Amino acid sequence: MPWSMKDYPASLKNLEKPVRKKAIDIANAMIDEGYEEGRAIPIATSKAKEWAENASTDEIDDFLTHDDETERDADPSSGSGPELMNKAEHVIKHKKGWAVKAEGAKRVSEIKDTKKEAIERAKEIAAHKGTEVIVHLADGSVQRKIKTGS
């Protein structure tokens, strides 16, 4: 059963609301990908804190207002979860740098300062899923495809 803002691990109780919600969202996704709870919680907490430090006020407000941390289970078209496990990871230009986004996802999974960092992160995700990375130029056209091997 996924965690929610009403039912979450005690270690998240002292986090600010946006950080807690993001940590729950990330931890739920990690559990879906096969991570153990004991590993997922600290990793998700760290990533959520990093996200909150780098996110704009508008992005945080949008996340708090619109994102449901348990949506992946109730709505298969939510843009996350098991149906994206066989999809390639794309590296695309973003207003804040370079983003990593699963093919067919509604939202980017991460934003990095440099294209190189985004490609490295996309390779990690794709290798875990056994899919490929598709790197785009700033204009959106495909620059190259990288096979990661499963």
Swiss-Prot record:
Residues 49-88 are annotated as: Disordered. Pfam families: DUF2188. InterPro entries: DUF2188 (IPR018691). It comes from the Bacteria. Residues 63-75 have a biased composition (Basic and acidic residues). This is Uncharacterized protein YdaT. It comes from Bacillus subtilis (strain 168).
